């Protein structure tokens, strides 16, 4: 009898445990990550939903960020100098970490964030596929982006477009990207809006269609860019485009005989667009084009005797047309117009891509002398520099009542100047402020060659 009672008690205990376990597992969800974010888009409004799993209880929190229109109607902020904003140290980190081989980096900001865009070579630093990446145009090049100040790696970067020439900007609602790829005699620009292909532009001169390598400029929901097609050492064709929600709504070919525009750096100012470009044909000063939202334009060259291109002659007497001395070849650069004055960014060296400085010429937009009142060191002449370009921070991002001017500098390393199998670069950036600043040198700082080069 005792044995029968004991057996029944054990069976009852087993049944009790089984029922209890079934009730518990029935109330539990399947295993989930602790935090899961889902971003949806509803009527151009970002809805960021974050699920937080605490003690098997789910709480749903929503943070809604309404889109805005980046007006671009404000004037540039008054500034007295440039404060350092970012430095990614990509080459230094890439000697050991997984960092993309890149060139042509640039920065662009929305009303929420700033991102670094760059053209990869489909390869990582210190890897065999980095060999031969001195080449500008290949089918492996892609436009990608990452948060500003971070080294561009496969783990923090977002694919944007297949491209060996590119531009990007944000209108307050979505990112517009422009990526050019294809053969030299028939390349096509692919326009994407919010990551979706919305339009294309075919090469119209069949001679290396190319664009800014820096941000496009947005005003009142429209974004504007400049493209070039034709010889790099002679008269070419130049068009300005108005783009709305990723679609070209208007374009105008510039009537610009004896002008040469490449790799324009564009920015909005009081509702209009100003672009300062590269003359690769015959000018050691920089050409400019300014236009309104209807693409009614004016053209000229920066008149200052402080020359902005590279190579260039020593400073002297400028011209409001192309300065032909040392005018062939060139480098992407930028300037900011303030009335008759101009902030000029340029390499320190007159004949190599090294050093960088910012110079304020109070009458340099229209005057031909070489007098200046401010010079701020950015990179020492003993360190490599490279391309440079403008980007702005809108009032919707900064909370200011003006458009903040900023710039980035590419710090090129490797071929053709150094004994490596690769060419890549890191970048630094600065923004204009009306408070204390300091001149110094912020070089790339990587020790070459790498293991792959030995």
Curated annotation (Swiss-Prot):
Gene3D superfamilies, A to Z: 2.120.10.10
Residues assigned to the Virion surface compartment are 14-454
Top EC category: hydrolase
Q: How does it sit in the membrane?
A: Single-pass type II membrane protein
- Where located? Virion membrane; Host apical cell membrane
Coarsely, its chief localization is: virion
Cofactor(s) needed, names only, are: Ca(2+)
Q: How does it assemble?
A: Homotetramer.
The family line of this record is: Belongs to the glycosyl hydrolase 34 family.
- What's its job? Catalyzes the removal of terminal sialic acid residues from viral and cellular glycoconjugates. Cleaves off the terminal sialic acids on the glycosylated HA during virus budding to facilitate virus release. Additionally helps virus spread through the circulation by further removing sialic acids from the cell surface. These cleavages prevent self-aggregation and ensure the efficient spread of the progeny virus from cell to cell. Otherwise, infection would be limited to one round of replication.
Q: What is this protein called?
A: Neuraminidase
The beginning of the lineage is: Viruses, Riboviria, Orthornavirae, Negarnaviricota, Polyploviricotina
């Amino acid at each position: 009898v005792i044995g029968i009672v004991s057996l029944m008690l054990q069976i009852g205990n087993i049944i009790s445990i089984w029922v209890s376990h079934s009730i518990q597992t029935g109330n539990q969800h399947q295993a989930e990550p602790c935090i899961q974010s889902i971003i949806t888009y509803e009527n151009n409004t970002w809805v960021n939903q974050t699920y937080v799993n605490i003690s098997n209880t789910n709480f749903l929190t929503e943070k809604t960020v309404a889109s805005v229109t980046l007006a671009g109607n404000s004037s540039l902020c008054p500034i007295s100098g440039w404060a350092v904003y970012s430095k990614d140290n990509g080459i230094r980190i890439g000697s050991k970490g997984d960092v993309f081989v890149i060139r042509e980096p640039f920065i662009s900001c929305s009303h929420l964030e700033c991102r670094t865009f760059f053209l990869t070579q489909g390869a990582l630093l210190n890897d065999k596929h980095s060999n031969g990446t001195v080449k500008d145009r290949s089918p492996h090049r892609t436009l990608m982006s990452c948060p500003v100040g971070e080294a561009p790696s496969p783990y923090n970067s977002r694919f944007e477009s297949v491209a060996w020439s590119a531009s990007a900007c944000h209108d307050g609602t979505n990112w517009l990207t422009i990526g050019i790829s294809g053969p030299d005699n028939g390349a096509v620009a692919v326009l994407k809006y919010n990551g979706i292909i919305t339009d294309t532009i075919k090469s119209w001169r069949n001679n290396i269609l190319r664009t800014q390598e820096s941000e496009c400029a947005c005003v009142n929901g429209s974004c504007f860019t400049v493209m070039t097609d034709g010889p790099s050492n002679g008269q070419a064709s130049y068009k300005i485009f108005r783009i709305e929600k990723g679609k070209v709504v208007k374009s105008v070919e510039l009537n610009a005989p004896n002008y040469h525009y490449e790799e324009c750096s564009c920015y909005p100012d009081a509702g209009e667009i100003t672009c300062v470009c590269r003359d690769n044909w015959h000018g050691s000063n920089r050409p400019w084009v300014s236009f309104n939202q209807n693409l009614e334009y004016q053209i000229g060259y920066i008149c200052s005797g402080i020359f902005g291109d590279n190579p260039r002659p020593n400073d002297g007497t400028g011209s409001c047309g192309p300065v032909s001395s040392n005018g062939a070849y060139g480098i992407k650069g930028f300037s900011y117009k303030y009335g008759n004055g101009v902030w000029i960014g340029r390499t320190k060296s007159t004949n190599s891509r090294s050093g960088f400085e910012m110079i304020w010429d109070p009458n340099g937009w229209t005057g031909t002398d070489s007098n200046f009142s401010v010079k701020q060191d950015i990179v020492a002449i003993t360190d490599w520099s490279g391309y440079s370009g403008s980007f702005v921070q809108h009032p919707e991002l900064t909370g200011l009542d003006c458009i903040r001017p900023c710039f980035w500098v590419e710090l090129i390393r490797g071929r053709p100047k150094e004994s490596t199998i690769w060419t890549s670069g890191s970048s630094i950036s600065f923004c204009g402020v009306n408070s204390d600043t300091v001149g110094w040198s912020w070089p790339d700082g990587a020790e070459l060659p790498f293991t792959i080069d030995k």
